[in-house]
Amino acid sequence: MSHEGSRQARDRGVTRSKAEKARPPTQPVPQVDIVPGRLNEAEWIAFMSLEEGEDVVGDILADLMTRVMECAFKVYLTQQCVPFTISQAREAMLQITEWRFLARDEGESAVAEDPTWGEDEEPLACTTDSWAQGSVPVLHTPAPVCVEEQFHNEEPGNPDQFLLGSSWDKESQKPTQPSEPSAEPKVTPRPTATLEAFEEAEPGDALEVPHGQEGSHMLAVPSKESLRSTAEGERVYSPQSSLKQPQVVRLQASEKESSFGSHLSLEDLYLCMPQPDAAGDRLSLQSKGQLHSSPIGSESHLGALTPAEPSAFQEPEVLGERPKHKTTTLRMDSSRLPRHWVRPVAEVLIPDLEVHPLEIYRGRPRRSQAGTATSACESQALSSRAPSKPHVSSPRFPLQRCATFRALGPDPSLNLAQTSPSFGSNVPFLSPGFRFLPRNPIPPDVASTPTPKLWPLAKWPSGWEREAEQLGELWAGRTRVPPQGQEPVEVTPLEEDSGWPLAAPQVLEATSQVLWKPMVISETMKLVPGVSMWNRGTQELLNPAVIRKEAEEGTPQAPEQQPIQTGVSKPQVIMKQIRNETPKAWLLPTKPVPHSGS
């Protein structure tokens, strides 16, 4: 047993030594440097374990500090609650007070001198020339020399003078040998100045012949009566000239007929015709029929009876030679001549226009025996058809006598009897002097009332006392004052009941008044001479500085006068009423005049 134990111990030693001899030698582990030569891996691991402990301690301290600061802030808010409420209330009260008392904004000062307020300069657009895209050159045809010379010689704005002077008398007048002046008056149908032109001229004035003659004849007009007397004297024919006169008239008619149809149209002739005036020119209906029937008849209306003058149309037996004719004539373009057309907004319709159109236009319709009987029958028929009603005296409100129909065109001399192209009817319009008169006359006690004191402080300039007093009487009593040289119109009972508008004489109209709200103080305004302003608040009439200066210096002023109001609103007619069978028109009420009493 002992032998076996020793053997085992010996075997173990042998095997251990063999194993140690067979095991390779262990190599040392190389060290990794984090920072070469300064910090190795073992030192880095030791530092990281130390920082982890510091981070844990820092988190614990931060949590503790946060809890302490929250408790301190809550205590601070509790202490500042009352002071904050007081400060907010103070600011609110100050803001409300500032809203109640607003300060005025003076704006910018010296804006004109500030360069930042100037307007930016904008370059001008280039003009379009012939090289622009889409531009087409236009060739203007030059007008004939004779037409341009006639336009320069004639006065501008007078188409009647150009038509009468260039187309009618140019052919008829030829330089002829002067013949012996005969004592026999001759009738030469050539266009001359109408009776209206002579009546408008004062005695002693000179009127120029419309057509352009080489001699430029000037006719001296001594007076209206002498002109009418000479015109009537020329209508008397002497027995010696009765044999030669038909030949002269026939020759002149043939010459006029050959040149008239090729130069002027019916429209041009209508423009050249003297229209009837509101003063009472007597143009019969027969002349209108002759105007449309033949050119010779229309020429007779345009022509006037003139004294015997050296004329181109004389008998061949007297002159010994035949008159020459112009071979080339120039045709005038009527579209190039200036025209005045009236385009009214509304047309006043009169039912009885077909019966007496010209009489209604002149103002007083002629009432013949047949017309009176017809009107009487019509009134009886209407009274029989209408049911009988008890007569109740009710106040009537007639239109004012001063209510005039204003002219619809800009030219005051333009006659409104001419038909407008916008209307197809031949209804003549009312003249500017046409007025509606009341159906019942005004009692004499009303007409004799004194002039009311409309404007107590109004002062009229010197030299207008009579006109102002007359206007005041017209406004106070609505009296009719006939013009100078005419008798007052007597209104018959038949005309009063007819209800038709009658023509009142021309009266002096005052300047229309305009109510307006000034944007500046009236005391600071400077009025130009001739302009006055009525202050309704102070009931004072503001005059220009020149009149005030005269009043302060003590110059004699006119007695206290009162201006009147003549501006009446125009009648307005709507389209629906024009289309109806029975037209209706009314006047809009005007604004009341202060202290007028009406």
From Swiss-Prot:
It comes from the Eukaryota. Pfam families: DUF4639. Keywords: Phosphoprotein. Residues 369-386, 558-569 have a biased composition (Polar residues). Coiled coil: none annotated. The modification Phosphoserine is found at residues 238, 242. The keyword Phosphoprotein applies. Signal peptide: none annotated. InterPro entries: DUF4639 (IPR028042). This is Uncharacterized protein C2orf81 homolog. It comes from Mus musculus (Mouse).
